[in-house]
Regions:
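Sec-dependent N-terminal signal peptides of Gram-positive bacterial secreted proteins and lipoproteins
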Residues: 1-12
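Collagenous Gly-X-Y triple-helix signature in extracellular proteins
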Residues: 15-396
Length: 396
């Protein structure tokens, strides 16, 4: 594992990708052992990519970058009895029992039910629900002793898997646990040294760092953007190119999909957009992007902050397109929760708005359908038609 110095700055320069990209570009822009993703309040190396054969979902594997998760024993143990523990005959020590919904361990270095495995469960449960929803559960069946563990959102690497880590992702700030036991003796498990070398087999009651891994399903990613200063709210300036490797996600939030928007007034280059059914509160916005003909995003802004007082769940927002050539482009408006640098954002489906007034009476007729048009308010002479659902309506 070679040492590579990383410069902690945001790099915007020609020749890179745009600082905001459609979610469909997420897997291709994230590079193994080079890209880092801010997610669930932590930073993660991208260490693997694949496609789910069952649904063609793009999947990435992540491994924690920083030693943010504390130290634990592989399994809590003591030389003397303690509550909810039992004796292991090989070393006459006492080790914590598995949770009641699991079979009990035969050796204390079994991963299922261990202190390390339960720590992974508690860390996963602390992740916000909408971020948990895009974590792909994994059945842990290999690289362990004892029973398998199903549907794990966070999990410890195996000792064998750690051998294949690259020069960046192999390093960590502390010696960290794998999930793999040392079969030479029944109360030891493997660790990895901070420099990435395969570590020692420690007694399971020793403390070492927790380093979680996870698999992320990118199907619900609406945008991927530079982790710092990537989503600059400025529609007048094209999105900058970004040569860095730190990214964050904007996830599609289906709870916002009843949001609607339409253009109701055009004054020169300024559109007045009427919106309804927006979420309000901290960090809630009406946002807009301009999409080029190829689907790429060329401009982004946050138009109105929805604090629930001045601006509520419905209202109007002015979008200034002065000096922007909209030929072949579309303007999309959406309801977004923008949470800042290195934090996951959430947004509803993009609503395309017209560059001209949208008249309420315009709609598409379905062939074979029956429609009634009431023009009574227009003072057109006619006779009431008793055969219509409303007999007060006139012939039209």
């Amino acid at each position: 594992c070679m040492v590579l110095c990383l410069v902690p700055i945001t790099v915007f320069a020609a020749g890179g990708a745009k600082a905001i990209l459609p979610g469909t570009s997420a897997q291709s822009i994230l590079k193994i052992d080079k890209s880092r993703l801010s997610f669930a309040g932590h930073e993660w190396w991208v260490i693997g990519q694949k496609t789910d054969k069952s649904n063609n979902a793009p999947i990435i594997t992540l491994l924690a970058v920083n030693n943010d998760f504390g130290d634990v024993p592989f399994r809590t143990g003591s030389a003397v009895p303690f509550e909810n523990a039992r004796r292991y005959s090989e070393d006459n020590g006492y080790y914590a029992n598995n949770p009641s919904d699991m079979s009990q361990w035969r050796k204390p270095n079994e991963y299922a039910g261990s202190t390390l495995q339960q720590k992974m469960v508690s860390l996963a449960e602390a992740i916000p629900e909408k971020e948990q929803a895009v974590i792909r559960p994994k059945d842990i069946t290999e690289g362990i002793t004892g029973q398998e563990v199903k549907a794990q959102k966070l999990w410890a690497f195996s000792q064998e898997d750690s051998i294949y880590l690259y020069r960046n992702s192999c390093k960590y700030a502390a010696q960290w646990w794998t999930r793999s036991s040392n079969e030479v003796y029944g109360y030891g498990s493997w660790t990895i040294h901070p420099d990435g070398r395969s570590g020692s087999a420690l007694n399971v009651d020793y403390d070492a760092a927790v380093r979680p891994a996870m698999e992320l399903d990118l199907s619900s990613v609406l945008f991927i953007s530079a982790a710092e200063h990537g989503k600059v709210a400025d529609l007048t300036t094209p999105i900058a190119e970004y040569a860095g490797d730190e990214w964050k996600l904007t996830l599609h939030d289906s709870d916002r999909d009843d949001f609607t928007a339409k253009t109701v007034l055009v004054n020169g280059s300024v559109l007045e957009v009427e919106y309804k059914n927006a979420k309000v509160g901290d960090n809630e916005y009406i946002s807009a992007v301009i999409k080029d003909a190829d689907g790429s995003i060329s401009r982004y802004t946050r138009v109105v902050q929805l604090d629930g007082t001045t601006n509520g769940t419905r209202g109007r927002a002015a979008i200034d397109l002065t000096d922007i050539d909209m030929t072949g482009k579309t303007l999309c408006v959406f309801n977004e929760q923008f949470n800042g640098d290195h934090k996951t954002d959430y947004a509803g489906a993009l609503r395309e708005v017209k560059l001209t007034d949208e008249i309420d009476e315009q709609f598409t007729l379905t062939p074979g359908g029956r429609y009634y048009f009431d023009l009574s308010a227009m003072n057109i002479p006619g006779t009431a038609n008793s055969n219509l659902p409303d007999s007060t309506l006139h012939y039209v």
